[in-house]
C-alpha cells in the first residue's frame, strides 16, 4: 500500500478565498489500497494553516517534504507591494509520523511566487515554478541543486526549450528522468496541456504534447506517472467533473510515440498536385 497526497478545498467550514469564492486549500493524505484511493484525511503536523497549502514533493525515504503555501511563516502573513500574498516554498521533516520543523527556502521573495515543487529521481535536484524577474514568460520552470546538508543552491531556468512566453507549471520528473509539465505556451489542445521532454545530457529536449485522452479542451495539470506500473494521475477542469478541478486516474495502454503525417493537396479537376497549398489540421476538439 502507498500514500497519496493531494490538495483540496473540500473543507467547507474554512474561510473562502476571494478570487474563486472557494475554501482555502489544505493538504490531505490518503491510502492507495488495491489501486483505489481511500481514507482521505488532513495531513498530520504543522503543514496546514488558515491560508493556502498546495503542492507537495516528498523524498524517497519519506522523511522530508517540500511544499508551497501563501507567504505565511511563524504567524506572519506578508504581501507584496501590490498587496498580493505570493506563494512560497517550504520544507518540513517527518518525525514519528508528524510533519514539523517548517523552514522557508532561501530564495523566497515577497514580490514574486515560488512553488509547485518536484524532485529528481536521485533526490539531488528540486524543480519549481516561479514568476521571478528574468524569466521568459508568465511563469517558468526552474531547478536548484540540493546540497548534502539540505541547503539549496542557486535557481537556474530550464531554458527556452521548456519555457515559453506563456505559463509553464506543475513540473514532475518520473523514475526514468522524463520531465512532465503543463503549459499554455506550447502548441496544445486547449488551455493548459500536459507535455513531456526526455533528459539528454543534463538538459530536457524535444518537448512533446502527451495527447489525448490526458489532454482536453480545458486545463490539464499536475500530471504524475509511475513508469514501472504504467499508471498515474492528472488533475483537470474538463467537462463532466464533480468539482472545479478533479483528479483522474490514468493507465498507459499504448506507448507514447511520434508519427509522420504525409498530405498531398491536388486540384479538384486536374487531380494534379498543388504547390505551396495551406493545410489546416483539426482534432476532435476543433483545435
Which role does the model predict for each range below?
Residues 1-264, 268-270, 274, 278, ...:
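Short, conserved micro-motifs composed of acidic
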